[in-house]
């Protein structure tokens, strides 16, 4: 019995030494882990309630015509898309009500070009066959307001979506046509990349819904004006820089 007690005592003593050594080893390993410096994590803070952006635009338009009167010639030519794709720019101010909701006011200037082949075909279809000359620019100047929802307003990349309305002033230098002003809804998606606290790289896409009237003048189609509508609906893809205040 005494021998067994001694053996148990020895075993207990050795176990205590082993447990103590293991605990010290674990403590050393924990202390050896370096502390992470959280000050090195990039943090983007936007304290400003105004964000001013300047952007360059690529304009993609189809401009299919509709509601043209019946041609006066027996074998009319097809009338295709009215304008070519174009380019432009805009400037905007985004007003933040809180971190998630904002409104954007923008004014743009976009340049498209009329297609001579379409003007020639329209002139032929109404018995005139006039030659429209060189392709002329078509200017679209949209004033736009959108309400925005910023999906993830914290961090370096901040996506947003928007919905709004626009009024577009239309000008053309072509002597044979006149295009009316138009208005309609606007859909918007975009990304703000915060390079610094107050500097933003912006990628923005707007879908304009625009169906302006086109008036073909007598010099192109005969004795009286001919009116149609064109489904312009330009898609404007923009990239630019912004600053928060």
Curated annotation (Swiss-Prot):
Principal location: membrane
KW Membrane (keyword) present: yes
Signal peptide: 1-23
UniProt xrefs under SUPFAM superfamilies: OMPA-like
Subcellular locations according to the entry: Cell outer membrane
GO process annotations (BP): transmembrane transport
Source domain of life: Bacteria
Pfam families on file: OmpW
InterPro entries per record: OMP/PagP_b-brl, OMPW
Family: Belongs to the OmpW/AlkL family.
Identification of the protein by name: Putative outer membrane protein RBE_0022
Lineage, uppermost ranks: Bacteria, Pseudomonadati, Pseudomonadota, Alphaproteobacteria, Rickettsiales
């Amino acid at each position: 019995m005494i021998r067994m007690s001694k053996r148990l005592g020895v075993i207990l003593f050795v176990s205590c030494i082993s447990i103590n050594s293991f605990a010290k080893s674990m403590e050393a390993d924990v202390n050896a882990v370096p502390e992470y410096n959280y000050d090195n994590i990039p943090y983007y803070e936007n304290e400003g309630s105004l964000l001013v952006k300047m952007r360059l635009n690529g304009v993609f338009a189809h401009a299919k015509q509709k509601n043209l009167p019946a041609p006066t010639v027996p074998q009319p030519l097809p009338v295709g898309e009215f304008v070519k794709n174009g380019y432009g720019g805009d400037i905007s101010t985004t007003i933040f009500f809180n971190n998630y909701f904002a409104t954007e006011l923008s004014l743009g200037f976009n340049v498209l070009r009329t297609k001579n082949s379409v003007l020639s075909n329209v002139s032929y279809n109404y018995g005139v066959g006039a030659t429209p000359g060189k392709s002329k620019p078509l200017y679209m100047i949209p004033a736009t307001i959108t309400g925005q929802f910023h999906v993830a307003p914290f961090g370096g990349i901040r996506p947003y979506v928007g919905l709004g309305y626009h009024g577009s002033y239309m000008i053309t230098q072509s002597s044979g046509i006149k295009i009316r002003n138009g208005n309609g809804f606007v859909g918007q998606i975009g990304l703000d990349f915060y390079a610094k606290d107050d500097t933003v790289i912006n990628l923005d896409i707007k879908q304009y819904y625009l169906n302006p009237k086109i008036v073909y003048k007598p010099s192109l189609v005969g004795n009286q004006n001919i009116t149609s509508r064109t489904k312009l609906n330009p898609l404007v893809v923009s990239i630019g820089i912004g600053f928060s205040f």
